[in-house]
Amino acid sequence: MLLRKQFFRLFSGLIVLLVVVNGIIWISRHHRKSNLDEHFRGEGIAAEFAGWNGDICNRLLDCYTLGSWEFKPGLTKKMIHERREVDKGILENLDFPRELHREDGRCGQINRLFPSGLPSLCDEESEKPCCNEATGLCGNSNADCLCPYCKDFSKYFAAELANWKPSSQKCPFQHFNSDSTCALLNEHVSDLVFIGDSFIGHLFLTLTLLITGDPVRGALRSTLSEEEKEQCSGELQFFAGKHSCHLKLIRDLEELDTNQLCNGKARFKSYFVEAYNVNQFPLAVKTVKNLLGKRKAIIVLGVGIHIHLNATMVIAKYLKPFLSLIENSGNDRPLLIWATIHQVDNFLTSDCVKNYSPIAKFNEEMSKFCRARNIPVFETSTVTRNIKSNDGQHVGYGGNIAKVQILLNYLKSRFEICQSSEH
C-alpha cells in the first residue's frame, strides 16, 4: 500500500512537472514569435512581405535576396580593364572569341561573328553599346536601347567588381571569411549538403574556396598534376572549358587534407550530390535518408534544367518524396532549402526571351509550391540580374560568392532568431 502511494505521488509529480515544462516552452515560443513579429514589423520589411503569410523563419531568406549590387569602394579604371582581360581569357578557354562584337558596328542574329558563327553583340565600352535587333545595328539612342528587341550592354558588369547589399536595414549582412564561416558551421551545422545540377554544385565549390581561403586552387583534387591544376586554377574552376575543369573538382570536403579545413578543426560535413535528373533521383533519396532526424543537417536543393523545366515532374519526383521521408521520420529535419534557377541576360534579347521565359515560369511554379509548405526559397534570380555570364548560363566567382554569403547570413539569422522556437 505504501509503495502504491509513493508511486502515485511520483506519477502526480511527473504530470505536474510536464505541465510546467510545456507551459514554459509555450510561453518561450509565444514570446519568441512576438519578438519575431516585432523584428519584422517595420515600414520596409512589411512592404516587402505584404500579402504573404508564410512562416517568418523561412521568409528570412527573402530578406537577403531582395537587394542590389554596389561597386566596390576604390574601384579604378585599371581594375575594370584587368577584369575585362580576365573575362576575355575565360571566353577563350570556353572556345569563344575573345571579343563578342564586330568592328563594323553590326549586331544581332543576322550578323554573326567569324569564324565562330555566334550572333554579334555590341561593345559595352564603345559610344554605341546598344543592339537594335530590328535594324541589326549598334547605337546609343532610345530607339536603339529601349525598344522591345533592344539590349543595352553597358548596364552589365562583372560581379567580381561589386558587392551584394540587401535592401532592408533589418537584414544585417556580414561578409564571411574563412574563420567566421568555420565558426558558424562548426557551432550550428552537422551536414551542409548540396543536391542538384551545376548551379548548385557551384555553391558547394564556392563554399569550399571560402572555407579553405584559397580561391585559386582550393577546390581542385590533390591528385591532379601541376599542369592540370594550372589549367583549371582560379575562376576556371567554374567553367568546364577546353580542359574539362568541372571533372577535376572535389565533391566532398573530406577529399581535402584536414589542415585545409578550418585549421584542422572542422566538425561539420559538406558535400555535393550531382543528382539533376529523374534517373539520378535514387542517389538523392539515399542522401536524404542518411540525414533523417539530424537536427543540424541542411540540404540545399535545386534541379529543373535537365528535367525540361517541368515543375510538375520535379515536385512529384523530388520534392514530394523528400517531404514524405522527412515527415514520416517523425522529425522535421533535415532542413530543406529550395534554390531557384538563376537567370542571366547579358545577351541578345531574342535569345533571352527564348531561353529564360520558361525558367521564370518554372521558378514561379516551384516557389509557389515551396512557400505553401514553408520551405525556404532561395530566389537566386534577383542576385544574378545585370551581372555578366561568360557562357550564357553560369556565373563565376563573383556571382557565386554573393549567393554563398547570402546563404550564410540567412543561416546565421535563422540560428540566432528562430532556433529556440524550432526545438
Which residues does each predicted region cover?
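A compositional signature for long Ser/Thr(±Pro)-rich, low-complexity
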Residues: 2-423
